């Protein structure tokens, strides 16, 4: 069989000048799907008749198409996957579980105000990310943007900070799964950790398509459950549940103690709210593996507003109306910890339903664990392609899995078994996990702030070098000022966390608690200074900033004519729908 039996379709990659996108097709059948790749086709083996085991083991071999840095991520995510990743991706333990400690620390009014503020900030961040992701749909996404548009040293610091955030989250989420099961039984937590770790490993072994399908299913369940809870909570508040002897509740609970622990309590909720929204930016990473980012990413970005408005703000307002922040069962108030969502249902004396929602919480935690593994592995691989991590982490197999990076992340998941060390009466696991959280605690603020700053630098350089916004496939309606506001919000949140870390709620300043709250900032600064000394990188001027390499431009006028070819009311409705969805 000769090369004449194959058609090679090579297209310029989205980010590298010498980075063709290669699809190899044999006459009569497809040998390889399109991949994000650069460089040359290497080590091609002619397709043969193979059984399942042969195909399975061959899939772990180096990718058929590789580039100099070894990346060959496949575009296997569809618009359907992107929609659910954006809507349900961050509906997880941060909302269902973490919000309990926020109510205990700051009270319902602080929670509602802070989540609205962080939600507004996230809208600015995600629209900026959407614009960049369409222009440069690359592996590494926003970490790559920070390296290119801000400073290589800062990109290095943010990338490692972001990776560590998701790297340490895997065992933490597995532990949350085990704790959540204690609602029903006191079975050894190691058993539950083993089960869920095995599930996550299997999902990731099947590659990005499996990740997309699993997230689609789990996110659908989370969305349905949250909408169902909102409807039920309204009925409970209005006194429509026969088993709830409290009758009409209205605002009687929230009026009792809207704020807890004063200004300190208010500031403390910032970090909890940020943790809840953590993961929203994953759509930027997924842009490198979606078939048509020009159509899929903008739609996913627009869905973020509705998710924030409905799933976060509305549900937390209803929690504030139904659950007292002084309840000792609330997470953060005592030894017996229950999700505020489950607690709201329990208070209405509805039998069976608390168990159903607790199961939904477990599903959401599995979803978050799956997403953290996906994100950490892709981030580590992206860093390796930029020479910010050892090169072997860029290894990608034939089905598009960043195999070595993925294995390292999954192996760290076994760290969750440290919970078993507490059986002898010690609290070693609490201490270890507190410091693991400290390593990653502020990562989201650095990442989101960097996205905004990257967008600002990109826009300024884009204008300086004579480009028009009409060349872009998607333009953030918030503009450059939206990114300025988003960056300011992130700086404000970092200041608030510094204040809370230094002046503890109910305690005096001490080094241990301060570094548990602010260690991530120290680590990011150390990464930045260390790389700056090593690489002696500098920030280029706007007129010299390279924005042309790999920039994907679009003829938006032709696309709009095709998309809105119909006239009349139908066209108006179509435009209105696309503006918000």
UniProtKB/Swiss-Prot annotation:
A Pfam family reported for this protein in Swiss-Prot or TrEMBL: AA_permease
GO CC annotation terms, alphabetical: membrane
Membrane topology designation: Multi-pass membrane protein
The entry's keywords: Amino-acid transport, Membrane, Transmembrane, Transmembrane helix, Transport
Transmembrane regions listed in the UniProt entry: 84-104, 109-129, 149-169, 187-207, 216-236, 266-286, 304-324, 348-368, 399-419, 432-452, 485-505, 514-534
One of the GO biological process terms: amino acid transmembrane transport
Annotated InterPro entries: AA-permease/SLC12A_dom (IPR004841), Amino_acid_permease_CS (IPR004840), APC_YAT (IPR050524)
Subcellular location: Membrane
GO molecular function: amino acid transmembrane transporter activity
Family recorded in the similarity comment: Belongs to the amino acid-polyamine-organocation (APC) superfamily.
Official protein name in the record: Uncharacterized amino-acid permease C359.01
């Amino acid at each position: 069989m000769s090369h004449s039996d194959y058609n090679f379709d090579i297209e310029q990659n989205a980010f590298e000048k010498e980075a063709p996108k290669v699809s190899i097709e044999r006459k009569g059948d497809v040998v390889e799907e399109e991949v994000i790749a650069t460089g040359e086709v290497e080590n091609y083996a002619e397709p043969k008749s193979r059984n399942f085991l042969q195909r399975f083991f061959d899939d772990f071999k180096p990718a058929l198409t590789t580039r100099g840095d070894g990346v060959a991520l496949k575009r296997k995510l569809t618009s359907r996957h992107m929609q659910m990743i954006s809507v349900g991706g961050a509906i997880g333990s941060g909302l269902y579980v973490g919000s309990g400690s926020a109510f205990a620390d700051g009270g319902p009014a602080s929670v509602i105000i802070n989540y609205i503020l962080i939600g507004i900030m996230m809208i600015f961040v995600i629209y900026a990310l959407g614009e960049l992701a369409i222009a440069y749909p690359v592996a590494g996404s926003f970490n790559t943007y920070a390296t290119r548009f801000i400073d290589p040293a800062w990109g290095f610091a943010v990338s490692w900070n972001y990776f560590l955030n998701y790297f340490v989250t895997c065992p933490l989420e597995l532990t949350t799964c085990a704790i959540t099961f204690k609602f029903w039984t006191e079975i050894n937590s190691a058993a539950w950790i083993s089960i869920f770790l095995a599930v996550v490993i299997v999902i990731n072994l099947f590659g990005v398509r499996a990740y997309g399908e699993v997230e689609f299913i789990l996110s659908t369940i989370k969305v349905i459950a949250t909408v169902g809870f909102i409807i039920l909570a309204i009925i409970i508040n209005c006194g429509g549940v026969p088993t709830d002897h409290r009758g009409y509740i209205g605002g009687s609970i929230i009026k009792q103690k809207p704020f807890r622990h004063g200004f300190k309590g208010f500031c403390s909720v910032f970090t909890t709210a940020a943790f809840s929204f953590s993961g929203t930016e994953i759509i930027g990473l997924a842009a490198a593996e979606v078939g048509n980012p020009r159509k899929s990413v903008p739609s996913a970005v627009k869905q973020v507003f509705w998710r924030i408005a409905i799933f976060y703000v509305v549900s937390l307002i209803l929690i504030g109306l139904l659950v007292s922040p002084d309840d000792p069962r609330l997470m953060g108030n005592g030894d017996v910890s229950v999700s505020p969502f489950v607690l709201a249902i329990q208070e209405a004396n509805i039998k069976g339903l608390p168990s159903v929602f607790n199961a939904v919480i477990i599903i959401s935690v599995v979803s978050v664990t799956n997403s953290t593994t996906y994100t950490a592995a892709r981030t580590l691989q992206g860093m390796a392609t930029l020479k910010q991590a050892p090169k072997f982490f860029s290894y990608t197999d034939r089905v598009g899995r960043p195999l070595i990076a993925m294995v390292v992340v999954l192996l760290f998941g076994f760290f969750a078994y440290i919970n078993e060390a507490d059986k002898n009466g010690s609290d070693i696991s609490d201490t270890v996990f507190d410091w693991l959280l400290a390593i990653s605690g502020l990562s989201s603020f650095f990442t989101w702030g960097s996205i905004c700053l990257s967008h600002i630098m990109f826009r300024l350089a884009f204008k300086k070098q004579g480009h028009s916004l009409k060349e872009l496939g998607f333009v953030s309606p918030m503009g450059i000022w939206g990114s300025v506001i988003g960056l300011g919000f992130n700086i404000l949140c970092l200041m608030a966390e510094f204040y809370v870390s230094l002046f503890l709620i109910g305690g005096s300043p001490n080094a241990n608690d301060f570094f548990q709250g602010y260690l991530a900032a120290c680590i990011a600064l150390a990464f930045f200074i260390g790389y700056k000394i090593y690489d002696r990188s500098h920030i280029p001027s706007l007129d010299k900033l390279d924005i042309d390499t790999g920039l994907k431009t679009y003829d938006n006028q032709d696309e709009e004519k095709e998309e809105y070819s119909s006239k009349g009311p139908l066209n108006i409705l179509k435009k209105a729908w696309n503006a918000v969805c």
